[in-house]
């Protein structure tokens, strides 16, 4: 049985332990077979600083890929330096 992504998508609040910065990780459905996972720098109350300019945005073509990417980024972002992580995903 295939899992169906909630129309609103996935959303996680993440506090980076090494830098104490806060981030929001969001995955949304952009089309039938297109999903976007984005990471936004956030304020103390986990409100994204710039909604139009995510720190990292990646597209995937299946729901399982999108969920895996979302949870992997959220988990790694808690314990790794953000700049290094973003550079790794951009290359």
What are the roles of these predicted feature ranges?
Residues 41-45, 70, 78:
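Short intrinsically disordered, low-complexity segments
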Residues 48-68, 72:
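A short, exposed loop/beta-hairpin motif centered on an aromatic-Gly-Thr core
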């Amino acid at each position: 049985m295939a899992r169906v992504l909630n129309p609103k998508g996935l959303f996680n609040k993440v506090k980076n332990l090494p830098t104490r910065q806060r981030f929001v990780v969001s995955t949304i459905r952009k089309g039938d077979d297109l999903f976007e996972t984005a990471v936004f720098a956030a304020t103390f109350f986990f409100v994204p600083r710039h909604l139009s300019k995510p720190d990292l945005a990646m597209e995937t073509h299946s729901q399982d890929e999108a969920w895996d990417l979302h949870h992997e980024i959220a988990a790694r972002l808690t314990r790794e330096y953000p700049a290094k992580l973003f550079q790794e995903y951009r290359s």
